[in-house]
């Protein structure tokens, strides 16, 4: 059975309403987002999941802008784990939030560039992008 978090918002960086479909009581919740800017919506989702009884909450994003209050909000949210990529340099953010795991996009981008140069399959590169 799937648990799904849904967020409805009218403007960027403003969490207007949050609804949870499914039961997370006593379960591990994982939030996957494309981009985290100020982390307002993300931390509202984390709070909602914890309030509904999630035993652990992990979050990830592919693009961590992490501007303004984002790092302080993530620290205060006491996530079990937070993962993002280095599409934006995260060196300073990692110093301030060492619990954050940053995945390098360099091997994936290098593989894609190589595949284009060799006229080979991009799908094959993507299928094995994070095998390590």
Segments from the language model and where they lie:
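Acidic, metal-coordinating catalytic segment for phosphate/diphosphate chemistry
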Residues: 71-132
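Short, small-residue-biased leader/transition segments that mark boundaries at the very start
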Residues: 3-8
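PRPP/pyrophosphate-binding module of the type I phosphoribosyltransferase fold
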Residues: 9-97
